[in-house]
């Protein structure tokens, strides 16, 4: 009798185990839900921005093909009173990058960002990173530059560098800001990153 009971218990255990395995087996729908969605490229550095690394044609079709996960749109822009058409890359209703045209307006000259979503070469972001933590070899050459009417400066590896970090000096600073070397060293260290800029290769 004991053998019969033990055999029945063993058979029941095997049946329950098989049932458990069937319940744990994922359905085709569950398998597809585990697929990782593509990640939007928010990086900018010497090699490009948003996955763009060439002087693309300044048209929506070309830019959409190069940055398919972004919402791409034409916008009117101006620099020093001169108007031109730029292209924006946005996600979630917020602009992340802006593509600026070259002199003839046919190709991308630069891609700039002042979005906190964009990440620089060391994963730094606008409004939080300071000049003091920038890699020295990446900011060897600096020039004074006004930022929204305030004193600031832009730095790269050299005068012809293709990636620039733009900083604004702390609010309230009333000392000299031009040339760059005239800015107080302590002020430089506390200056905040406000823009990153990639320059496209010349056509």
Language-model segments: residues:
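C-terminal motif of bacterial Sec signal peptides marking the signal peptidase cleavage site
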Residues: 15-18
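A broadly tuned "polar low-complexity/structure-edge" signature
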Residues: 152-153, 162
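Long, compositionally biased
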Residues: 96, 158-177
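Short alpha-helical interface elements
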Residues: 4, 88, 158-160
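Bacterial N-terminal signal peptides that target proteins for export
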Residues: 1-8
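Repetitive helical segments and hydrophobic/amphipathic motifs
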Residues: 11-12
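Short helix/turn-capping signatures at newly exposed starts of structured segments
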Residues: 20-150, 156, 179-203
């Amino acid at each position: 009798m004991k053998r019969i009971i033990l055999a029945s218990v063993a058979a029941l255990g095997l049946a329950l185990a098989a049932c458990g395995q069937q319940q744990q087996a994922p359905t085709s729908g569950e398998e597809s839900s585990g697929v990782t969605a593509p990640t939007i490229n928010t990086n900018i550095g010497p090699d490009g921005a948003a996955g763009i690394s060439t002087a693309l044609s300044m048209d929506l079709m070309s830019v959409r093909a190069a940055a398919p996960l972004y919402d791409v749109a034409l916008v009117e822009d101006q620099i020093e009173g001169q108007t031109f058409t730029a292209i924006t890359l946005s996600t979630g209703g917020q602009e992340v990058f802006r593509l600026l045209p070259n002199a003839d307006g046919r190709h991308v000259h630069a891609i700039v960002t002042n979005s906190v979503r964009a990440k620089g070469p060391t994963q730094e972001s606008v409004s939080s990173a300071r000049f003091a933590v920038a890699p020295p070899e990446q900011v060897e050459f600096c020039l004074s530059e006004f930022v929204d009417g305030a004193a600031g400066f832009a730095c790269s590896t050299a005068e012809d560098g293709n990636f620039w970090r733009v900083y604004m000096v702390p609010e309230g600073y009333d000392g000299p800001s031009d040339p760059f070397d005239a800015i107080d060293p302590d002020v430089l260290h506390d200056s905040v990153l406000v823009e990153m800029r990639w320059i496209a290769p010349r056509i």
